[in-house]
Each structure stands twice: as structure tokens, then as C-alpha cells.
């Protein structure tokens, strides 16, 4: 049983890291004006603000903050 659980965890982590390596990340920008920061004055967490920026056009994208800068993935489901 422990072997099955360990194998399942290994497979899940492998899939996660494979997907992370496949996704292309692009700097988030508002109206095409440079790279957007994750910091905000809206009392939102950096992750939530970045997620809002990446989905502002209604397209489904992943988002992440790296060193307080927001990055968006390519459109996942056009």
C-alpha cells in the first residue's frame, strides 16, 4: 500500500513538473505598456492581483508572481 501511494505521489509530481516546463510564460502588461508588478493598492494578494491581470481579457491563463513581477501563460483553452 505504501508503495502504491509513493508511486502515485511520484507520478503526480512528475506530471506537474512536466507541465510547468511545457507552459510558456510571458510578462504581464496592461494595455501593452511594459511589465506589470504584482504589488497593488487594492488590498489583494500578489497572486490574486496577477491572476486578475492575466484574465482581464476573459481568456483562461495561468499566472504567477516571480520577484514581485507578474507572468501569464499562453491561452490554455482558446
From Swiss-Prot:
Coiled coil in keyword set: no
UniProt propeptide residues: 22-32
Signal sequence residues: 1-21
Tissues expressed in: Expressed by the venom gland.
GO molecular function: potassium channel regulator activity; toxin activity
Modification after translation, per record: Contains 3 disulfide bonds.
UniProt keyword annotations, A-Z: Disulfide bond, Ion channel impairing toxin, Potassium channel impairing toxin, Secreted, Signal, Toxin
Function: Reversibly inhibits potassium channels.
Protein's name in the database: Toxin BmTxKS4
One term under GO cellular component: extracellular region
Localization: Secreted
